[in-house]
Amino acid sequence: MSEDLYTLRSLFGGAIVSTFPLRFEDVSNIRQVPDHQEVFVDLRRDESLIFELLDLKTDVADQGSATWFLQDLARDQDAEGTMVLEQSGVFQADGLGFRGTPAIITTAFGQMELDQTNYTIRLGISKGRQGRDAQNIVKVYLANLRLKDVGTDVLITAYEPMLINPLSESAAAVGAGWAVPASNSGNMPMAEVFKSAVTNFKVNDWGLFGAAA
């Protein structure tokens, strides 16, 4: 049984909230994070959860938008062996929208070979590229919440290591080899953490996006 303690977490100064375990620590407490990101990490398991606010990609269709962002992420990170394993259809979040216009949500799940697995691969302040010989196999979960009336694509991305290369720096923190299943260590599986973060995502202050109430 999971021993994770879930709680409502404040994002972007409280303008947004979401719910996920306390074991994910706010990276901004230890180093600077870009203004458009909120980054949380469990260093004991080398798992991370990232919230990003991006300008709306008007040239990307709603259908498969999460897959597009997942593949774009793989290109940015020079990931090898990228496979999109699952993608959702398009659905509306009636409880999340500006002036009655619901958000559009799609999700995708894939696998990548990366030479780093934690939050640093997104921040560009990494441990240092370690090369192809030190790649880890990582599960990546991505949700795209499209807030069209405020011109914003929200990305929620979760990273879960599957296989840690003994040559990677991650091995020093969590050990090399196949990752210990979360349930075996009393933690909620990353898929459930991701689901909670997405389904409990709420905007409290639309002024964050420059929108008038």
Task: Tell me what each language-model feature is.
Residues 52-60, 72-74, 176-186:
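Short histidine-centered catalytic/ligand-binding loop motif
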Residues 2-34, 39-41, 48-50, 57, ...:
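N-terminal "mature-domain start" segment
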Residues 46-51, 58-62, 113-121, 164-169:
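Short, surface-exposed beta-strand/loop "edge" segments at domain boundaries and coil↔beta transitions
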Residues 20-23, 45, 144-154:
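Short, solvent-exposed coil/turn segments at beta-strand boundaries
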Residues 54, 145-150, 157-161, 204:
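Structured beta-strand/turn binding interfaces of compact recognition modules in eukaryotic regulators
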